[in-house]
Amino acid sequence: MSRQINTPDWILHANAPLRELNTFHIQAQARWLLEIIHPTALPQALTHPHIVGLPILVLGSGSNVLFAADPEECVLRFVNREVTILEHRIDHTLVRAGAGMAWHDLVLWSLQQGLSGLENLALIPGTVGACSIQNIGAYGVQVEEFVHIVEAYDQTEGKFVRLTASECEFAYRNSRFKREPNRYLITAVEFRLPLLHELNLNYAGISEELEALQITLPEPCDVAQAVINLRRRKLPDPEVLSNAGSFFKNPHLPREQAEQLRQHHPTLPIYPGETPESNKLSAAWLIEQCGWKGIREGDAGVAPQHSLVLVNYGEATGAELLALARRIAASVQERFGVAIEPETRLIGAQW
């Protein structure tokens, strides 16, 4: 970084390289990178002459973004990683975590405190701040089930706000924050975590993994370990093979259309959708049927372990990975008549 401006509450970097700040390890550079240590100083930092008026791009752990070009925005990172217990109740505990805390660290911390609810979401990359934007989910659980309050700076109103879970307007891999991307800067999230929680063991091999671990009466920490084992087998480690996890969302279709597809493709996995009239399809299955699993084109490719995961074998550019993703989606559309869309956020390009 060529130069930086330091204060006790925030640091502003000029011409900041972003390769180590995104898990695809794409070469990109931010004209300005603002790191927020204490979120209360956010209004002051945003009025600095170098960045005042610039659009803001919030970057958590960089685990759900693809830089197709250098960002034009001022890149903002929260580095507040504290977690505190706000209140104990008979059946639940309220917990507050800073936006910069790694999500998996929060899951492990909650289990160490004897709390439950987040165990199925173990090992998901990203930060606490990003979890509410994306409404992260895995193994039958979505984070919206446990979000109590989202604290954010409302850029439109110029003030800090506290939004309830209903005000966040959560949906499948979606939220108010995703639909209004330039309005809210999430600074912290409060979670309502139960003390006694019915474990969700009915999804994607968790029961089988617990059986392999010889656990007959599982506790939340056992479920978390099972999920960790499953994810490590299915998904490549970004520190070993650069990737951003699942690149595509599972498509949702009207139930009748999904059933018609299965008549032509009997092995097509179909899951319940968000409404009784809809179903969710496996994007991984659709992509694999089109022959993309394990494909490599230069340094851009599809992971051998999982067809939802695009990988950078070394020096692939964001534009090359995006071009590959578009070809994959086009082949699924042509063969099955189903549109698949990226779950990963695209920077410097439109889908």
UniProtKB/Swiss-Prot annotation:
Per its UniProt record, what InterPro entries does this chain match?
FAD-bd_PCMH (IPR016166), FAD-bd_PCMH-like_sf (IPR036318), FAD-bd_PCMH_sub1 (IPR016167), FAD-bd_PCMH_sub2 (IPR016169), MurB (IPR003170), MurB_C (IPR011601), MurB_C_sf (IPR036635), Oxid_FAD_bind_N (IPR006094)
Q: What is its main location?
A: cytoplasm
For this protein, the Enzyme Commission number is 1.3.1.98
| Reactions catalysed according to its record | UDP-N-acetyl-alpha-D-muramate + NADP(+) = UDP-N-acetyl-3-O-(1-carboxyvinyl)-alpha-D-glucosamine + NADPH + H(+)
* Any one Gene Ontology molecular-function term assigned to this protein's record: FAD binding
Which Pfam family name is an example for this entry?
Answer: FAD_binding_4
Q: What are the names of the required cofactors?
A: FAD
Look up the record and give one Gene Ontology term from the biological process aspect: cell wall organization
Q: Which residues form the FAD-binding PCMH-type domain?
A: 25-196
Keyword set for this entry? Cell cycle, Cell division, Cell shape, Cell wall biogenesis/degradation, Cytoplasm, FAD, Flavoprotein, NADP, Oxidoreductase, Peptidoglycan synthesis
Protein location = Cytoplasm
Q: Per its record, how is this protein called by name? A: UDP-N-acetylenolpyruvoylglucosamine reductase
The species this protein was found in:
Xylella fastidiosa (strain Temecula1 / ATCC 700964)
Q: What is the lineage of its organism?
A: Bacteria, Pseudomonadati, Pseudomonadota, Gammaproteobacteria, Lysobacterales
